[in-house]
Amino acid sequence: MSEEIESILEANALYHVYDSKAEDGNVVALRGLHVKVKPGEAVAIVGPSGSGKSTLLKCLGGLMKPSAGNVSLDGKNMTRLTGQELILLRQKTVSFIFQEGNLLPHLSALDNVAQPLRHQKVSPKEAKRRAQELLDELGIGHRAKGLPSTLSGGE
């Protein structure tokens, strides 16, 4: 029987609520999410604008404390660490590519979305097919050939 590989990053019952004075009340950005990432695994966070992608990544990377739930990185509960302990753990384990620089400028939107699949050894044809399907699902399939410099921030 094979031994199960442990997660390098794990989030359990993750919630994040932004306070708001708007008529609708507070904004729930994350609602009970569970995430597990194993060493060497490539993961893409995909969703429409305003769906909580950036909030999730900030919570997973220790840049923001979740309203509830916990995040473990390299076996340590990050949600309980503060100050220097948290800084040292982040320096050893996690890096960020912020939204402004996360697309490869010489590749089309389609090829950028297909990249994580190619790293998982998915054939180029299948990776492009799946990437186009995802872009269509998000309502931006018509922008598949666009270079990052021609896309808006929400695309």
Regions found by a protein language model. Give the residues of each.
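ABC family nucleotide-binding domain
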Residues: I5-E155
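A short, compositionally biased domain-edge/stem linker segment
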Residues: M1-S2
